[in-house]
Swiss-Prot record:
One Gene Ontology cellular component: mitochondrial inner membrane
Residues found modified as Phosphotyrosine: Y218
Mitochondrial matrix domain ranges by topology: 46-59
NCBIfam families from the UniProt entry: CoxB
InterPro entries to which the protein is assigned, alphabetical: CcO_II (IPR045187), CcO_II-like_C (IPR002429), CcO_II_C (IPR034210), Copper_CuA (IPR001505), Cupredoxin (IPR008972), Cyt_c_oxidase_su2 (IPR014222), Cyt_c_oxidase_su2_TM_dom (IPR011759), Cyt_c_oxidase_su2_TM_sf (IPR036257)
Lineage start: Eukaryota, Metazoa, Chordata, Craniata, Vertebrata
Entry superkingdom: Eukaryota
Origin species: Bos taurus
CDD domains for this protein: CcO_II_C
Protein name, per record: Cytochrome c oxidase subunit 2
Length: 227
């Protein structure tokens, strides 16, 4: 969950998001070291009176600054590709939910159940109850079981949308005429908020996403009450 004046990411709730946080720290360390080295070299160039106007070539230096960046790029690319393949992997999902983007709300369909579908609209600010979050609360939350692999099928009825939940490391484009898929698995129960992350019109900011992850027995009770 985000909070005011937050500088970092939201707390990771899924294994994928934990991997993304580790990759971010790994890449940030490399960028910090390179930036420090470049700033140090620039400061030396500005403060020293020594020059090398007679130097015509320096093959050793050229070899180093060709090979070293290649090694650094490999150190960044390998963990990035690993996470990319992990995000695309689908392992026997326990539940499949189809979400459709509309201007400007989301609709959900639990394909493993008959007639379990609903629309999810943002609750207007004037109707919020004490403790509820402005521009993030919806009238129908997406209730899902925790610690289970869930497949999300994402598409759109009209224009481009994007279904995103930061704390779960999810962001999937909703494209008209195309069905994209992603998987999620929450390691703990709770409410997780997201929003449409693709500009889709005048009310783009009013398309929140709320996932309610609960233990399996509570999910079964909820699904039975919705049928």
């Amino acid at each position: 969950m985000a909070y005011p004046m937050q500088l970092g990411f939201q707390d990771a709730t899924s294994p994928i998001m934990e991997e993304l946080l580790h990759f971010h720290d790994h890449t940030l360390m490399i960028v910090f070291l390179i930036s420090s080295l470049v700033l140090y070299i620039i400061s030396l160039m500005l403060t020293t009176k020594l020059t090398h106007t007679s130097t015509m070539d320096a093959q050793e230096v050229e070899t180093i600054w060709t090979i070293l960046p290649a090694i650094i790029l490999i150190l960044i690319a390998l963990p990035s590709l690993r996470i990319l393949y992990m995000m695309d992997e689908i392992n026997n999902p326990s539940l499949t939910v189809k979400t459709m983007g509309h201007q400007w709300y989301w609709s959900y369909e639990y394909t493993d159940y008959e007639d379990l579908s609903f629309d999810s609209y943002m609750i207007p600010t004037s109707e919020l109850k004490p403790g509820e979050l402005r521009l993030l609360e919806v009238d129908n939350r997406v209730v899902l079981p925790m610690e289970m692999t869930i497949r999300m099928l994402v598409s759109s009825e009209d224009v481009l949308h994007s279904w995103a939940v930061p704390s779960l490391g999810l962001k999937t484009d909703a494209i008209p005429g195309r069905l994209n898929q992603t998987t999620l698995m929450s390691s703990r129960p709770g409410l997780y908020y997201g929003q449409c992350s693709e500009i889709c019109g005048s009310n783009h900011s009013f398309m929140p996403i709320v996932l309610e992850l609960v233990p399996l027995k509570y999910f079964e009770k909820w699904s039975a009450s919705m049928l």
